[in-house]
A protein has these predicted regions:
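Catalytic His-Asp segment of secreted/periplasmic serine-dependent ester chemistry enzymes
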Residues: 294, 355-467
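Solvent-exposed, polar/charged alpha-helical surfaces in well-ordered, non-transmembrane soluble domains
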Residues: 115, 119, 123, 295, ...
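Conserved N-terminal glycine/acidic-rich loop preference
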Residues: 305-318, 326-341, 349-389
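Hydrophobic membrane-insertion alpha-helices, especially the h-region
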Residues: 8-27
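Juxtamembrane proline-rich low-complexity "stalk" or linker regions positioned immediately after a signal peptide
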Residues: 28-73
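Conserved SGNH/GDSL esterase-like catalytic core that processes O-acyl groups on lipids
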Residues: 113-330, 419
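Active-site-proximal beta-strand/loop segments in catalytic clefts of secreted hydrolases
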Residues: 107-110, 277-281, 311-316, 351-355, ...
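Alpha-helical scaffolding within the catalytic cores
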Residues: 80-96, 288-302, 330-338, 373-375, ...
């Protein structure tokens, strides 16, 4: 009996099956898995007994029909509260798909300073795509609440300069916007909870710098100098990398002579996701638009090569209505322009602030009036400049969320109705990860759909040429 299924459709379905099943058997292709085989029936099963009104057209009777079906699923899986019409996140998604190494940097204010939100997003990304290491951390704690989950740090005898309240005013404070000037007697220590392969120290190259020694559990593993050497330009970032011996519990640094202006330490394991949390207490958008020296910041960004740059400001500014309405948008546009000049290939994501509550005259906790305006402004900036936008405000529940969070059990926000408790921060971190994970799934399905259509076209042409 002659098959009732057209040749092209048969070839297309077989191609789809190969694309679906091959990654299951070849570990190196695991990141190309879009759905489990047991779920494939939802995509390719023919209707058993369609109703008369629906039986006129078989949606899978041609490659074009199959393509339309897959595209409908893509639309259905579009990430919520994540807007990326220019597909700027495709660079980030492609890096995840390659499964080699992916670097995310996340600029923010107080919650990011404490590694709230970012720690939970980091854990989820590293669980899903591999743990590439702790990433960039500061030399010591500029504030008591500075934190990076998975590492304990301490330091002494440093002169600390923060870009947002800088005394030097030169804007040369490294990737994390904080520098640490030290002479002999200045020390830093980092205790990592899991083994890392290497640590790279960043500092300012100077005409007359200083020297330092790096130790693993008290034993020297290398030395470095911040004095400009042959081919090095003074007042540019410098880097010194050291391999970490197996089973090392603590990395230490000591300045041994002169004076060194350090920026931070970058801990790496290898392939996987690195998620660097770059929070500054009390920071606002002008940190990136004005306080950073642009050439210096560009050099730092190009060295660390982030695949995704998240800019997450607005909470502190939302308390100043005049600034929000007259200046904030202009400053954020400057930030985006700086980033696009520095890293034209990187994915850039503007992440809106969370809700911010205030107690009303009758004791109710309402969203402050400036917050929806600020979020709307940021959304428009993202659309105008061709970067992605994650609407944290709407994702967490929109207006009135902090009031609901404050009265929930357990309480999800502090008594200022601004700073999330760890459980609240976890929710936001999961929302961010979920949106990007859904975007990644959509990206994979789009790649799969394109492969199906291309393969169907090729096999159809071959079949038509057969005698």
């Amino acid at each position: 009996m002659r098959s009732v299924i057209p040749v092209k459709t048969t070839l297309t379905v077989l191609t789809f099956a190969v694309l679906l099943l091959v990654p299951q058997g070849i570990p190196s292709l695991k990141n190309y898995m879009s759905i489990e085989p047991k779920s494939a029936i939802a995509v390719v099963t023919f209707p058993a007994k369609p109703a008369a009104a629906e039986a006129l057209v078989d949606p899978l009777a041609s490659p074009a029909g199959l393509s339309q079906t897959v595209n409908k699923r893509l639309l259905a899986k579009a990430p919520r509260n994540l807007s990326d019409p220019a597909h700027v996140l495709d660079h980030f998604y492609a890096a995840l798909l390659r499964g080699e190494g992916v670097h995310i940097i996340h600029y923010g204010d107080s919650p990011t300073t404490a590694d709230l939100i970012t720690a939970d997003a980091r854990a989820l990304f590293q669980h899903e795509f591999g743990d590439g290491g702790m990433g960039f951390v500061l030399m010591a704690r500029p504030w008591a609440w500075y934190n990076h989950r998975g590492i304990e740090m301490s330091g002494s005898n440093w002169k600390i300069d923060v870009s947002s309240t800088s005394n030097s005013k030169d804007g040369l404070n490294g990737l994390g916007a904080v520098s640490f000037r030290g002479a002999p007697g200045a020390v830093s220590r980092w205790k990592v909870k899991t083994a890392h392969r290497s640590v790279e120290l960043a500092y300012l190259v100077e005409p007359q710098g200083g020297t330092f020694v790096v130790e693993a559990d008290g034993n020297p593993i290398g030395t470095g100098s911040s004095t400009a050497g042959a081919g090095e330009r003074p007042f540019t970032p410098g880097y010194a990398s050291f391999n970490i011996p197996p089973r090392t519990a603590e990395i230490g640094l000591k300045v041994t002579s002169g004076s060194v202006r350090f920026y931070g330490a970058d801990f790496r394991k290898g392939a996987g996701v690195v998620y660097s949390s770059l929070g500054i207490n009390g920071a606002n958008v002008t940190l990136l638009s004005n306080a950073f020296n642009e050439a210096h910041w560009t050099a730092e960004l190009r060295h660390y090569k982030p695949d995704l740059i998240i800019v997450n400001y607005g909470t502190n500014e939302s308390g100043f209505p005049d600034f929000v309405d007259s200046t904030w948008g202009r400053e954020m546009r400057k930030v985006v322009a700086r980033l696009q000049r520095a890293m034209p290939e990187a994915s850039i994501l503007l992440m809106s602030p969370m809700d911010r509550g205030a107690k009303g005259v009758h004791g109710e906790i309402d969203t402050i009036p400036t917050m929806p305006r600020l979020v709307a402004t940021e959304s428009k900036i993202a659309a105008d400049t061709g970067v992605a936008f994650f609407d944290t405000f709407e994702a967490m529940g929109g207006s009135g969320t902090m009031g609901r969070w404050y009265t929930s059990e357990p309480r999800l926000v502090g008594s200022d109705y601004i700073h999330p408790m760890p459980a609240g921060a976890r929710i936001v971190g999961e929302l961010l990860f979920s949106a990007l994970r859904e975007g990644f799934n959509q990206f994979k399905l789009e790649q799969l759909n394109q492969n199906i259509v291309r393969q169907a076209d090729r096999t159809g042409q071959e079949a038509s040429q057969q005698p």
